[in-house]
């Protein structure tokens, strides 16, 4: 016994940052710990880390999720696996284009394309660096030296190769189809990128007239689309309108270049209770219109162009924006005495997820990934994957139930991966690049090694090098991929697809896909679709789907609500003695939240303990500090207390003279460690964290340690061995959650870092556990009762107390309990 080896008297954020900086500053040691070594001979476990999108401040809910993904990676290392935990950044897409447009005050199409791409790349690199710093601050143990960027030539080359492979298989097609289109941003979007926002609208009852003079009221919120009406329908069972079926009805507005009347027929999709029960079907008001046009074989009209303006078919409204045309049509109908009623109402309006602009359905020639034909096979493959929690698998299945059309993957934007296609001068042949080569067809010709394919049959006709002179002036495709077309290749990319066949054979299906529930229908679904189409394989062994980070009242955080909390301010809270203060808007008033110290270790512990995977979690810095910083303090105090006692020379060999109370605590400890090991194996962070927290701060610190302090001070070997063995193993088991805390304490105490442990600590006991573990609750109840009695009598805990009898079931611990509480007869 001597002065504590752990000289720092308390855990602090400054100490945490010092350890972190040492941890990340030595790249050689860092890589020895965390770099992926596929030749180690260990079981390979690949984490398909969600490549975050750098668009300003990293959302605190996402930072919390990534800290738990790191816990998964570290726990699998602790279980002896060779973990590849890549760091990737998703840098393609419309978000950075929006940012550049906002910064410059100019729309994308006013730039030269190359100039705009350079601006996007420079801007996103600034955000990427800030994100790297936050990733390190929250303690991620990624293989940063193997960072991948989805806008790099390497990644884009793989994306383009996958496109070519799917095209050759017939799983990618080019077609003129109705597409969801954002006219403000000038691009097609997929179903999964559509949100519905509550907005005010007008339900207008309009009087139409049949050719034989019968008035019919039709209700609509889109009168500007009357010019694109292809048919009027009623429900086949609606007796009110049986006499109208087969009649021709005249459009109540002027049009250009089309018939002035359409037929009235029946269709089961009509909701008789909506408005008058008579529906105009236009090209295209919604997906039901699309389905009816397709089913009845109607020729669609293009009422809205790519700029969001009305076309010639709209007659006097040509060139107007949609909203303006809507009001003008209402005015003209009113002047013609054809407005029966106008009802102001709120309506769920479909808008683009990123731009929040009302979307239209427009006929466009786009590229599509076929998906409806493979849904049954995908469901079979999904059954081969383990979901955490199992209930969140339903998010995926529910989304798949709604899939009825192919996935449009081409966009009319710029900062994305280009569609890797050139067209021959006659348009009958296409040229595709060699595998892995990134190309930009809008500004360069096909590279050497490209192949020429028949556009319709996809037959390979030969090499570009041999046939180029026969193809005339080739034209490069100007469209690009949807962002998810790139992002959904992440598991293939990190597992070595195309680049390392040997690794891919060992690493795929990928070990785990960790992500939030909000991108199940996009990132998860599209990734699984690719794996099914390309490889007929499940994409992953495990899928971990977490909930969302919410404000203290359970609301989504957003700029409009003013309830966001900056992640870095929480991680830095307490550094340099600076406290944290957050002013956020609550449901009723603005609230000031305050905390003295949090840091990354407390933040990680909070996320691990406070909510089970899949549950939404409320983020309140005050609660994080109050509930969890004290846990670190208590465990730190246990370790520091231990550090004043000599570490036994052999912590692997069980002493022969264990005291009864040591046998009891070791029995309880073994059960806890078995529970934790099982939890890490099952990727159950919550159970592992709660088990370690409860044991460390409960039965160990508050009960056993108080029971044996006098023995420790007397130099008792059994007590010292038991204490050090538990502290050492606890730090190993705890290291996935709080790595820097565990590293510092274990390195100081045992001259080995807990984060370097590559096997879960186990202890072999040569006595029966059951008899001991059965009395644990009784021990805790007895101790609490004695403490309560002393408090009621105004006695300090070190004061003798009489007339307390140790219960019969605790007689094996009578001596240490008597000594602990100073019981007298």
What residue ranges belong to the model's regions?
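Short, solvent-exposed turn/loop segments enriched in Gly/Ser/Thr/Pro and often Arg
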Residues: 41-42, 50-51, 84-97, 147-155, ...
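Phosphate/diphosphate-binding loops
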Residues: 324-349
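Glycine- and acidic
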Residues: 4-12, 50-58, 113-117, 142-149, ...
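Feature 926 captures the class I aminoacyl-tRNA synthetase adenylation module centered on the KMSKS loop
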Residues: 2, 205, 403-485, 489, ...
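Active-site-adjacent "gating/activation" loops or surface patches in catalytic cores
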Residues: 257-265, 476-508, 513, 698-705
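NTP-handling and nucleic-acid-processing catalytic cores
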Residues: 14-26, 72, 137, 141-142, ...
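N-terminal catalytic cores of NTP/NDP-binding nucleotidyl/phosphoryl-transfer enzymes
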Residues: 38-99, 150, 159, 218-221, ...
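Non-catalytic terminal extensions that flank enzyme cores
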Residues: 1-60, 83, 340, 353, ...
């Amino acid at each position: 016994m001597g002065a504590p080896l752990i000289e720092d008297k308390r855990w602090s954020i400054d100490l945490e940052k010092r350890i972190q900086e040492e941890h990340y500053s030595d790249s050689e040691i860092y890589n020895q710990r965390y770099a992926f070594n596929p030749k180690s001979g260990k079981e390979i476990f690949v984490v398909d880390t969600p490549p975050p999108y750098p668009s300003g401040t990293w959302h605190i809910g996402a930072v919390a999720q990534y800290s738990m993904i790191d816990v998964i990676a570290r726990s699998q290392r602790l279980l002896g696996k060779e973990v590849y935990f890549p760091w990737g950044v998703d840098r393609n897409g419309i978000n950075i284009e929006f940012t550049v447009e906002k910064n410059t005050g100019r729309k994308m199409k006013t730039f030269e394309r190359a100039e705009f791409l350079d601006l996007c790349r420079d801007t996103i690199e600034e955000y990427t660096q800030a994100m790297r710093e936050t990733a390190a601050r929250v303690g991620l143990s990624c293989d940063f030296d193997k960072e991948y960027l989805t806008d790099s030539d390497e990644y884009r080359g793989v994306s383009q190769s996958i496109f070519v492979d799917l095209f050759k298989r017939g799983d990618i097609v080019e077609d003129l189809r109705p597409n969801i289109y954002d006219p403000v941003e000038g691009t097609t979007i997929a179903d999964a990128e559509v949100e519905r926002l509550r907005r005010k609208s007008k339900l207008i009852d309009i009087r139409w007239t049949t050719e034989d003079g019968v008035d019919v009221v039709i209700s609509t919120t889109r009168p500007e689309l009357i010019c694109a009406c292809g048919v009027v329908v009623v429900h086949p069972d609606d007796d009110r309108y049986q006499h109208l079926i087969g009649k021709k009805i005249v459009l109540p507005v002027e049009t250009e270049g089309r018939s002035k009347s359409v037929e009235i027929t029946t269709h089961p999709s009509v909701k008789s209770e909506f408005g008058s029960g008579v529906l105009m079907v236009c090209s295209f008001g919604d997906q039901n219109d699309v389905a009816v046009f397709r089913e009845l074989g109607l020729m669609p009209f293009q009422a809205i162009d790519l700029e969001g303006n009305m076309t010639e078919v709209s007659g006097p409204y040509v060139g107007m924006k949609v909203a303006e045309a809507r009001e003008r049509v209402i005015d003209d109908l009113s002047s013609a005495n054809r407005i029966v009623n106008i009802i102001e109402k709120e309506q769920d309006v479909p808008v683009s997820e990123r731009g929040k602009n009302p979307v239209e359905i427009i006929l466009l020639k786009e590229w599509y990934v076929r998906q409806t034909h493979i849904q049954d096979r995908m469901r079979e493959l999904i059954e081969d994957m383990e979901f955490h929690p199992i209930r969140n698998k339903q998010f995926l299945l529910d989304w798949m139930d709604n899939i009825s059309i192919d996935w449009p993957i081409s966009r009319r934007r710029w900062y994305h991966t280009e569609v890797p296609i050139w067209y021959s001068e006659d348009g009958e042949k296409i040229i595709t690049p060699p595998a892995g080569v990134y190309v930009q067809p809008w500004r360069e010709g096909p590279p050497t090694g490209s192949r020429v394919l028949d556009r319709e049959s996809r037959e390979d006709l030969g090499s570009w090098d041999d046939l180029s002179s026969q193809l005339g002036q080739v034209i490069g495709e100007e469209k690009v991929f949807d962002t998810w077309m790139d992002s959904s290749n992440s598991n293939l990319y990190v597992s070595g697809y195309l680049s390392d066949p040997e690794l891919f054979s060992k690493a795929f299906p990928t070990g785990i896909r960790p992500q939030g529930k909000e991108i199940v229908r996009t990132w998860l679904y599209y990734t699984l679709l690719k794996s099914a189409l390309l490889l007929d394989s499940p994409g992953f062994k495990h899928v971990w789907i977490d909930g969302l980070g919410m404000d203290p009242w359970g609301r989504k955080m957003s700029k409009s609500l003013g309830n966001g909390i900056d992640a870095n301010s929480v991680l830095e809270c307490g550094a340099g003695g600076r406290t944290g203060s957050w002013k956020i808007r609550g449901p009723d008033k603005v609230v000031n939240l305050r905390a003295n110290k949090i840091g990354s270790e407390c933040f990680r512990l909070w996320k691990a303990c406070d909510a089970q995977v899949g549950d939404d979690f409320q983020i309140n810095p005050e609660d994080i500090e109050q509930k969890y910083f004290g846990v670190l303090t208590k465990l730190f105090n246990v370790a520091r207390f231990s550090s004043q006692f000599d570490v036994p020379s052999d912590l692997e060999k069980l002493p022969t003279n264990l005291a009864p109370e040591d046998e009891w605590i070791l029995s309880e400890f073994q059960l806890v460690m078995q529970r934790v090991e099982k939890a890490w194996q099952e990727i159950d962070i919550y159970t592992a964290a709660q088990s370690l927290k409860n044991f460390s701060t409960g039965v160990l610190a508050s009960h056993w340690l108080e029971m044996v302090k006098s023995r420790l001070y007397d130099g008792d070997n059994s007590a010292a061995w038991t204490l050090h063995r538990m502290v050492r193993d606890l730090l190993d088991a705890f290291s996935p959650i709080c790595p820097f805390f565990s590293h510092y304490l274990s390195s100081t105490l045992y001259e080995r870092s807990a984060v370097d442990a590559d096997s879960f600590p186990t202890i072999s006991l040569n006595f029966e556990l059951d008899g001991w573990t059965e009395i644990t609750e009784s021990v805790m109840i007895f101790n609490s009762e004695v403490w309560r009695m002393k408090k009621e009598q105004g006695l300090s805990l070190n004061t003798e107390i009489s007339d307390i009898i140790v219960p019969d079931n605790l007689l094996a611990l009578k001596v240490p309990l008597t000594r602990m509480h100073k019981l007298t007869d």
